[in-house]
Structure formats: C-alpha cells, structure tokens
C-alpha cells in the first residue's frame, strides 16, 4: 500500500533538511524551513477548526508559503481548492462559494472576500503562523483531496476533483513507484522554473517531481523573460506552452544565451505542428519533450527526441501512452476501433478525476466504467504512437457538413510559413456557421497557398471562410489560446475577404 498523499513529500523533505527546496531571488528556503512553514500552517488550520473533508480555498502568489499552505491542508485531509488568478467576479462564487469552510489568502481583494461568503478568512501572516503543529497525515482515501478549476472559457469553471486515493497513486507524487520514464524525466529537474500559478494541476505535479527528486524550485522575481531567464537562473527544467516555445524558436535572443544547463523543456497545453517540433528538436535536442494530457487525467503521453530518431513518422504524433496509462480509440457508440482508425480517445489511470465537483451531469457524460473520454479525436499507429486530429466537440457545421476545427488547424500548420494556426466557428447567415482561421506567419504567405493546403488535405468544403494574419495569439490564464478573443479581433471581416493583417 502506498503512503497516503502527501506523506511521501513530507518524508522526502525531512530526509534532506539542508537541501534548498525553493529559491526566490536572494531568498533560499531549505527543506527544513519549508517543513517548519508546513507545521505553522498546520497549527493555524487546526486552530481554525479544520480537518478531514473540510474545503479550504487557497489564493496565494507563487511562493514557498503558498505551497506550504497546500501541503498543510492536504496533510489534514482537507479538500484543497486552488483559486487561480484572473477569475472574474462572476466566476469566483463557482470556485470559492462551493462548500468552502475557509479561505487562506495573502492579500484577498473585495471580490474574493465577497465570494467567500461565510467561510473563515485566514490571512497569511504572523497570527496564522504563530504556533507550529507537526503535520500528521489524516487524509481518507475516499475523500476529495484537490479541486482544480478549469478556465471557464466556455462557461462557468468546472472543478476537477481528485480523491486522496488518486493523489496517493499519482504518477508524480510517489517516488517509490516511479516508472523508468518518470525517473529519467525527474533526473533533469535539478533547478525547476516555477512560475504562473500554484493552482495549475500541471505545475503542481511537476513541482512535486522536482522536490521529490531532490531538486530546487526556482521562482523568478518577475514574469519569466524567456529565453534569458533560463540562462540567468541556470534552469535545468521548465514547462512551456506552445506560444512560449514559438517565442523561444523565433527570438534572436535564443542564439545569444547559454542554455547548456537545460535538460528538460516540456511543451504541452495545445497542439504543436510537426515542423515546429522538428525545429525544437534541432535546436534543443534531447531536452525537448512534447506532452499530452488533461487536467482531468494528468500526463498521458510523451514524445521525445529518442522516439523520433527511432521512428520518424512519430514526429507527427504526441508520443506513446505512458506505462501507467490505458488508452483506447472508440467510435461514437463506444466501440473500440482498430489500429489506424480515428475516433475519440478514452483513457484510464489510477489517478484520473473522481468527477466534476457538484456537477453530476457533466461527470456522467465524462466517465464510463472508470474510463474517461478526453473529447479529443485521434488514432494509434502500429507502434503505439498517438496522433491527434481534432476535438470531438470542436465542430463547425457549414452547409450542414461537420468540420473539425483541429483538423483545419493541423492542415494550415503543414504550410512551412505558418507558425501557429487557430480556427474558430461563428454563426453565418448563409451557411449556418463559418470557419475563421487565424495564423501567425514567418515570411509573407499567400492566402491561395493556405487555402490550397486545406483543400488538399481536407477538401474544398473545409477551406475557412476567412484567414486573418495576427502578430500574436491572445492566451487564457492557462496559457491556452483564447479563441473568443481571436474572433473578436475579426470584427467585420466578411466571408469573402482575403488574408488580413491585424
């Protein structure tokens, strides 16, 4: 039986007390000091009457204190709810007002306080941290350990709920059970760049990987200025969104900085075109890893330089399922499809979500007999590599014909001059809906060439109504493309217009 989460982390910190856990500018926090912070938060939470099953919302910056608060609440068996930056006044009640007993925050604003309602407000400071109490792991396996809310870009944020059982079996939180591939990845996390938000499930699991492997989480003093932050802080591992990777590849500064310390650059969050992955492998070599996963499922597949060297078609894939992941491709009726056939990707692991918090309808649609539908479309080849082709629900119906935005995006990205491609559907009086494409290009690209690529790959009917060149793609707080904002930039572009620069 594995140690109940987060026992392995607490034991790991205690085993090497002098090793640095966090580095933030001139401040270095040792593992012993981090454990002391955890004990002080534990004391404060216990005095507030909190224990197993209680909801604790945590709203902090990326700091050692923020992580210590999360560990303390988890050790007590609480349901830890991350409050990410950027939530609107309308979204906050969906996050903080859902059965939360306490709010832990360093500087809560009026909107957050209003959303918290009757919950106890515990401000991080001398009073809360006055009396330490040794953390004793009290989590009950069947209880919810963590609720991570989605961006809410398509409506109210959905809370991805993981049990203590799932966290106990999680791929990154149990070093005694790490697979060979996880151990190899962790070896590169000596100095892990920690930025963005501690509410990100992805950032959390890789922070765990860093600390459990004896590494140091390095927090930049300001938003990271890629690529120079990698050289300045001697970073060995970093997560990247696709737009950040594009910046690294396209910035003249990348050739000017010393990146010899870098061992892992893991890109995930949205599709990466094969020719851009090829550029990244050429530039960064074995440090480059492309990952695929969901907040609901965790890390599912990885594509490495070693994979591409052994099987060149793998460049068009997102890698093979990790050893602890079961994966099937199914048709619309739920039947398993043979190798090479495209369908919806279903996965099963020991650490998938229990469901969406207080949302039984969405949960029932997502989980069937322990299997989770990703709502992504793809196929597996004979060597087990997964190829993504679109989103099961990201459809645009033009003249009663269904088109997948992801498929059009991937077709546009085949053009060597296209660095990014995003497709959005919008109502159209003539065709019901119309597909509108937005591309970031390097050199000048002719509209006719882009239309020809889509027509060749998918047929004339899939060619977007408009193609707009943009300098950069707006992103959501999660780092994913903000397609709503892209559509707003289109303004009054008519379906017959040619490529427009914005």
What positions do the PLM features span?
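Conserved AMP-binding/adenylate-forming core of the ANL superfamily
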Residues: 2, 18-49, 55-63, 71, ...
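Conserved pre-ATP/AMP-binding loop-to-beta segment of ANL
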Residues: 18, 131-149, 155-156, 182-192
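Conserved AMP-binding A3 loop
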Residues: 30-32, 145-172
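Conserved structural elements of the adenylate-forming
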Residues: 35-43, 160-184, 195, 213, ...
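AMP-binding/adenylate-forming catalytic core of the ANL superfamily
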Residues: 103, 349, 354-355, 365, ...
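Conserved AMP-binding/adenylation subdomain of ANL enzymes
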Residues: 171-191, 199-237, 251
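Gly/Ser/Thr-rich phosphate-binding loop
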Residues: 236-239, 251-312, 326
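AMP-binding/adenylate-forming catalytic domain of the ANL superfamily
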Residues: 459-480
């Amino acid at each position: 039986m594995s140690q109940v989460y987060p026992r392995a982390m607490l034991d790991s910190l205690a085993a090497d007390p002098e090793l640095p856990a966090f580095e933030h500018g001139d401040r270095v926090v040792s593992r012993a000091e981090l454990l002391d912070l955890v004990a002080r938060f534990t004391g404060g939470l216990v005095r507030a009457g909190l224990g197993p099953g209680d909801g604790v919302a945590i709203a902090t910056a990326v700091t050692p204190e923020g992580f210590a608060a999360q560990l303390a609440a988890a050790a007590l068996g609480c349901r830890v709810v991350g409050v990410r930056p950027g939530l609107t006044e309308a979204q906050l009640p969906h996050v903080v007002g859902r059965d939360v007993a306490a709010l832990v925050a360093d500087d809560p604003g009026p909107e957050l306080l209003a959303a918290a309602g009757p919950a106890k407000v515990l401000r991080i400071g001398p009073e809360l941290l006055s009396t330490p109490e040794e953390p004793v792991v009290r989590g009950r396996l069947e209880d919810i350990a963590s609720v991570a809310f989605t961006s809410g870009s398509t409506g109210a944020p959905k809370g991805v709920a993981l049990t203590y059982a799932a966290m106990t079996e999680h791929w990154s939180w149990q070093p005694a059970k790490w697979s060979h591939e996880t151990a190899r990845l962790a070896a590169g996390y000596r100095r892990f760049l920690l930025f963005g938000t501690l509410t990100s499930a992805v950032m959390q699991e890789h922070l765990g990987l860093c600390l459990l492997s004896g590494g140091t989480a390095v927090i930049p003093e300001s938003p990271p200025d890629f690529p120079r932050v990698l050289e300045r802080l001697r970073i060995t591992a970093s997560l990247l969104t696709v737009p950040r990777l594009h910046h690294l590849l396209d910035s003249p500064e990348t050739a000017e900085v010393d990146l010899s310390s870098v061992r892992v650059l893991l890109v995930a969050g949205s599709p990466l075109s094969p020719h851009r992955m090829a550029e990244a492998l050429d530039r960064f070599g074995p440090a480059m890893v492309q990952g695929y996963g969901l907040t609901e499922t965790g890390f599912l597949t990885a594509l490495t330089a070693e994979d591409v060297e052994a099987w060149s078609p793998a460049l068009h894939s997102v890698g093979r399922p990790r050893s602890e992941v079961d994966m099937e491709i199914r048709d619309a009726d739920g039947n398993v499809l043979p190798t090479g056939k495209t369908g919806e990707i279903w996965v099963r692991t020991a650490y998938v979500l229990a469901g969406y918090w207080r949302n039984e309808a969405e949960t029932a649609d997502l989980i069937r007999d322990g299997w989770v539908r990703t709502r992504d479309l793809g196929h597996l080849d004979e060597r087990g590599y997964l190829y993504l082709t679109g989103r099961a629900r990201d459809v645009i119906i033009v003249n009663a014909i269904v088109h997948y935005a992801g498929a059009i995006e991937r077709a546009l990205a085949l053009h060597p001059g296209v660095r990014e491609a995003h497709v959005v559907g919008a109502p159209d009086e003539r065709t019901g809906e119309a597909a509108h494409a937005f591309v970031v290009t390097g050199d000048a690209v002719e509209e006719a060439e882009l239309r020809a690529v889509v027509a060749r790959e998918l047929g004339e009917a899939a060619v977007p109504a408009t193609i707009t060149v943009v300098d950069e793609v707006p992103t959501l707080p999660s780092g994913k493309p903000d397609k709503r904002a892209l559509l707003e930039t289109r303004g009054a572009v008519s379906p017959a217009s040619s490529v427009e620069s914005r």
